[in-house]
Curated annotation (Swiss-Prot):
Stated name of the protein: Adenosine receptor A3
An annotated GO BP: negative regulation of cell population proliferation
Annotated glycosylation sites: N3, N4, N12
Entry GO terms, CC: dendrite; plasma membrane; presynaptic membrane; Schaffer collateral - CA1 synapse; synapse
Disulfide cysteine pairs (residue numbers): C83-C166
Impact after mutating A105T: In a colorectal cancer sample; somatic mutation
Family: Belongs to the G-protein coupled receptor 1 family.
Length: 318
């Protein structure tokens, strides 16, 4: 028994250390993303407003979700609904990310499909409405267990329990996780987004091959759109790669399969690590992001005044 307890303790320490590292990287990286969009006027477009929404969800993962995941992993004894609320927070920001990614995909589709009418369609009012809808859906889906779809109201064992050792599976129903959270609000949107990006690439390829106007400007426009779409599809691919393993683990648990603790920890860490991946993708794939990153970092290192930083970024964005 002591050996098992020591092994579990070592596993928890390693897990918590990794969560703290991922959380710090996610916070710093995504705060930098928001600063880049705020400082660079050329990045203040519809797509990048949705990217800021995605960054806010990732910051929330770092600030709120990861510490809560650590509390859950330690199995601290707390009130049932306090534990349930914490686990719901783990889900809200996941769905905020997927909804932001869906909004980005739809925006890029409108950009290449309605090239002439795009600016008339994507008004500021509609952008804010879309952002509000993304977060509203995320809160409704994530908080659904608080309204009854949980172990308290559906399990004989937990019905009379007020305080318990806080564990994800002790409060959260796996049928909710598998059928509602994963299949309905993660898997289906992922399939829809893949279809949207395939159509985007198809439209761009046709426009570039036909090039009916024989205009260099048109060719350059669709060339830029192709590069941007590839970068954003990579963000989507990394999200799927990060979250699908944990979703598969939840499916295995739901169908009474055995999942080793180490595998579960790795699935959780991989899903949380997605929050620190996007700033790296932007830096490598989007030139204006990379240039603004470097200007901000240079200003921080050599202590440039903010006015000179703004001037440098304005010149860079022209």
């Amino acid at each position: 028994m002591p050996n098992n307890s020591t092994a579990l303790s070592l596993a928890n320490v390693t897990y918590i250390t990794m969560e703290i590292f991922i959380g710090l990287c996610a916070i710093v990286g995504n705060v930098l993303v928001i600063c880049v969009v705020k400082l660079n006027p050329s990045l203040q477009t519809t797509t990048f407003y949705f990217i800021v929404s995605l960054a806010l969800a990732d910051i929330a993962v770092g600030v709120l979700v990861m510490p809560l995941a650590i509390v859950v992993s330690l199995g601290i004894t707390i009130h049932f609904y306090s534990c349930l609320f914490m686990t719901c927070l783990l889900l809200i920001f996941t769905h905020a990310s997927i909804m932001s990614l869906l909004a980005i995909a739809v925006d890029r589709y409108l950009r290449v499909k309605l090239t002439v009418r795009y600016k008339r369609v994507t008004t500021h009012r509609r952008i804010w409405l879309a952002l509000g809808l993304c977060w509203l859906v995320s809160f409704l889906v994530g908080l659904t267990p608080m309204f009854g779809w949980n172990m308290k109201l559906t399990s004989e064992y937990h019905r009379n329990v007020t305080f318990l050792s806080c564990q994800f599976v002790s409060v959260m129903r796996m049928d909710y996780m598998v059928y509602f959270s994963f299949l309905t609000w993660i898997f289906i949107p992922l399939v829809v987004m893949c279809a949207i990006y395939l159509d985007i690439f198809y439209i761009i390829r046709n426009k570039l091959s036909l090039n009916l106007s024989n205009s260099k400007e048109t060719g350059a426009f669709y060339g830029r759109e192709f590069k941007t779409a590839k970068s954003l599809f990579l963000v989507l691919f990394l999200f799927a790669l990060s979250w699908l393993p944990l979703s598969i683990i939840n499916c295995i648990i739901y169908f009474n399969g055995e999942v080793p603790q180490l595998v579960l920890y790795m699935g959780i860490l991989l899903s949380h690590a997605n929050s620190m991946m996007n700033p790296i993708v932007y830096a490598y794939k989007i030139k204006k992001f990379k240039e603004t990153y470097l200007l901000i970092l240079k200003a921080c290192v050599v202590c440039h005044p903010s006015d000179s930083l703004d001037t440098s970024i304005e010149k860079n964005s022209e």
